[in-house]
Amino acid sequence: DDDVLVIAHRGAAGGAPENTLASVALALEHGADVVEIDVQETADGEVVVIHDSDLMKVGGNPMRVWEATFDEIRAVDVGSWFGPEFTGQRVPTLEEVLETCRGKAVVDIELKYYGHDEMLEQRVSDIVERTGMGDQVIAMSLKGDAVVKMKGIRPEWDVGLLTAKAVGDLTTAEADFLAVHVGMANSAFIHRAHEAGKDVYVWTVNDRLNMSRMMSRGVDGVITDHPSLARLVLEERAEMSPVERLLVTAAFWIGLEPKEPPADLDLEG
């Protein structure tokens, strides 16, 4: 059987506004094993959950996260852009997301850097310590030195490197797991990573055939905007014979569904 984690990308971002408590709650409702979120520091040192460097996409506001106080950021509605039913959603704190997921799912904390971070790794560590959820978090970053720094502060955590392109041999990177664009995750790469003791998570996978193809290749986790679909694919595969699974992979190659999108950092990031 497949031993694959369903990792909800920015919460269940296909069904609710990304990185909000609504998307986190939906991810839990849809059976995510792991809830992935992005964190940054505000001007006054709060660790908040938001992907972009400003609030234009989610709030129609050019306010930059590192220049604004937590209260200023909290005043912005970051739900109505997605749908009127989400009006009133606010940028949550890391602590709020951790409390929402307590005892229900692992939280994958992606450390975001836009050149203005001060103590992000230490502050994240302190918040997790304060909530007593050290055994329920993992962390990752696009920056290799941030991975090393976070691992230095929290050697007991699984800390991973996130990447959209192969630079050298990633399997030798100082990281516990590799979160790679789906286009990089060929069978040879996955095998080398596993030989090096590293799990492989792929992002961002939002269609059935790609999900099934990645599961057949032996990835350890699928990062998706649609955790309910990933859970359904896992359930369907559990009922399939090996031949039926091969037919699903064949369907991908003859073009029954679109192949993976080009590697674009904003797909994850």
Task: Describe the function of each predicted region.
Residues 1-269:
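Phosphate-group recognition and catalysis centered on beta-loop-alpha active-site segments
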